[in-house]
Amino acid sequence: METFEESSDLDVIQKHLFEDLMIPDGFIEDFVFDDTAFVSGLWSLEPFNPVPKLEPSSPVLDPDSYVQEILQMEAESSSSSSTTTSPEVETVSNRKKTKRFEETRHYRGVRRRPWGKFAAEIRDPAKKGSRIWLGTFESDIDAARAYDYAAFKLRGRKAVLNFPLDAGKYDAPVNSCRKRRRTDVPQPQGTTTSTSSSSSN
């Protein structure tokens, strides 16, 4: 049985919840309801067909028949879906398989050039963050090692490195990509440059 406190608590909750739903008395009197429109709307509906009674022995209530029908539908849908595949779907799936995304790791201080080489640089805190060029490398790992070497020399143990376990183990990597140098172009024989000065009288 409920105690007085429990029932009063329930009454307070009920009053709080349903108080907003109370309909004022004037609302019902002012509300105009046209029953003729409602009744004429009912007559325009189609006649109601009740659901026929099923006998317990009917196949509709037999669970085994349901299982067999479901299995038949699944077999039909799988055979029809395999024969009606569109070429557009196949080409899209083939494109996805043929596209191969290279997963490359982004190393600190390394940028990839559009032509495929890797540039390494570091900012020098002593010179207001100006960049120090470390070189251009064939692989991103070589460029990252160059950055690590320079960072370790500049900042010491506080340096944030790409390969922290290799700190101080390697020498400075050699810049594998060199700038193009001009080769001395031989000049045609008709033009000579004289280095000797001619004496004039």
Swiss-Prot record:
Alphabetical list of PROSITE patterns matching this protein: AP2_ERF
Biological process according to GO: ethylene-activated signaling pathway; glucosinolate metabolic process; negative regulation of wax biosynthetic process; positive regulation of DNA-templated transcription; response to water deprivation
Subcellular location: Nucleus
Low complexity: compositionally biased ranges: 74-92, 191-201
Membrane-spanning residues: none
CDD domains: AP2
Protein name: Ethylene-responsive transcription factor ERF107
